[in-house]
Amino acid sequence: MNEMLKEELLQSIREVKDYPKKGILFKDITTLLNYPKLFNKLIDALKKRYLALNIDFIVGIEARGFILGSAFAYALGVGFVPVRKKGKLPAHTLSQSYSLEYGSDSIEIHSDAFRGIKGVRVVLVDDLLATGGTALASLELIKALQAECIEACFLIGLKELPGIQLLEEHVKTFCLLEC
């Protein structure tokens, strides 16, 4: 990815202090979405990175991973699979719990998400990688469906948190922007 695109992306992402709680500097990608030409450049850059890898599906993590992932899947001409919070998917699901700072949560994927095909090649997508808990749980769901995660792809990776290092122990990880 070229440095000019990275700088444009950084400039388009709003930072919100003390959200969702005091001490957090939230990276809000919704402002990036207001710039269609820049968003197209982002999706084109991701397409270029993954086009030759014979990807079958993009797996997007709720909720902003849906925005990036569905546009990315469309650009590649592949299917999109959502990973959602527990109780949000209507058909039979597989569930995976993960730890939060104060407790735990669960995410789910439809058990037929990859149309019952084993060995499909997927890229896991989300807007931001912080601690890695949700991404690791998503990887477990992908593995449970006997799919191969080629890479986990994030718009932003937070260097001061353990997510990048933790995730790289399990899957090749790409963060377009490391902040």
Swiss-Prot record:
Gene3D superfamilies, per the entry: 3.40.50.2020
Catalyzed reaction equations: AMP + diphosphate = 5-phospho-alpha-D-ribose 1-diphosphate + adenine
Keywords attached to this entry: Cytoplasm, Glycosyltransferase, Purine salvage, Transferase
Pfam family, one: Pribosyltran
Annotated GO MF terms: adenine binding; adenine phosphoribosyltransferase activity; AMP binding
Predominant location category: cytoplasm
Compartments (UniProt record): Cytoplasm
Oligomeric form and interacting partners: Homodimer.
Family label: Belongs to the purine/pyrimidine phosphoribosyltransferase family.
Function comment: Catalyzes a salvage reaction resulting in the formation of AMP, that is energically less costly than de novo synthesis.
The protein's name: Adenine phosphoribosyltransferase
Native organism: Helicobacter pylori (strain J99 / ATCC 700824)
